[in-house]
């Protein structure tokens, strides 16, 4: 494929596991009790514990009329993105927002209102779509470039990385990858297959030859599922892998095996 770096080529799974590579040139994150970078670094080096608490970033610079529309999960995602969205060429940098569940609590409330024949709030309805946080960020920060929102089951982070690698291969100088999730409503408790705690993080991704933490990610089909992490949901465990400095992280979910590797 002329003009496409070898590390961005998605190989046929019948021939060999597919693989991508990229550099993480910066990161930021927010969760209750972990508002600062040094808090996250200390958390990653210690025993795995889940973020707990009811706090949310204040977003004091956002006009009150807009700030009232942004729920807790959205505030966390916007705050994490803000600290990474620092490039002078920001309009040329796509954003990939990924959340396994999104604002499912808002959707449940809308369904409850429908079930009781109550009128739906137009604002609540508009904010229930999966790309609502991405759209709010583009409005609040006047970002007019490319953004998209994904959900892909347990391996949502990995699939978002594949999307980001494709954008880099297509010529984007960097890509911002924003991952966020929160607790599930009680009505879904019987279906939860991993822990669920509030968090948001953002990685700034670039080509693998750029300075930063160079990671590779390969995947292959037909892998038996592994037991989920009893403490951290998968998206949070991947961020801990980046911060802790581990050489490898292997995950098997939904008949797919994903292998994270650190280089250099």
Summary of predicted features, one role per range:
Residues 78-81, 151-175:
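Active-site-proximal alpha-helical scaffold in enzymes
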Residues 2-124, 128-149, 179-264:
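Conserved "HGTGT" condensation-loop signature of ketosynthase/thiolase-family condensing enzymes
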């Amino acid at each position: 494929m002329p003009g496409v770096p070898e590390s961005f080529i998605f190989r046929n799974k019948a021939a060999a596991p597919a693989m991508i590579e990229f550099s993480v040139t910066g990161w930021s994150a927010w969760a209750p009790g972990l508002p600062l970078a040094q808090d996250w670094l200390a958390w990653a080096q210690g025993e795995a514990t889940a973020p707990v608490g009811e706090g949310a970033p204040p977003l004091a610079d956002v006009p009150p009329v807009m700030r009232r529309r942004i729920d807790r999960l959205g505030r966390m995602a916007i705050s994490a993105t803000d600290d990474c969205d620092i490039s002078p060429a920001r309009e040329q940098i796509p954003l990939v927002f990924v959340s396994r569940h999104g604002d499912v609590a808002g959707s449940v409330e809308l369904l409850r209102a429908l079930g009781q024949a109550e009128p739906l709030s137009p604002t609540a309805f508009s904010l229930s779509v999966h790309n609502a946080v991405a759209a709010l960020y583009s409005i609040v920060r006047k970002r007019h470039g490319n953004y998209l929102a994904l959900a892909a089951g347990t391996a949502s982070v990995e699939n978002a990385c594949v999307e980001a690698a494709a954008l880099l291969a297509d010529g984007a100088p960097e890509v911002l990858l924003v991952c966020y999730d929160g607790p599930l409503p009680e009505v879904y408790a019987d279906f939860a297959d991993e822990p669920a705690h509030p968090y948001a993080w953002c990685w700034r991704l670039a080509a693998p030859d750029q300075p930063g933490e160079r990671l590779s990610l390969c995947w292959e089909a037909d892998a038996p599922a592994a037991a989920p992490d009893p403490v951290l949901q998968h998206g949070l465990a991947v961020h801990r892998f980046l911060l802790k400095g581990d050489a490898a992280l292997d995950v098997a979910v939904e008949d797919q095996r994903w292998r994270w590797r650190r280089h250099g």
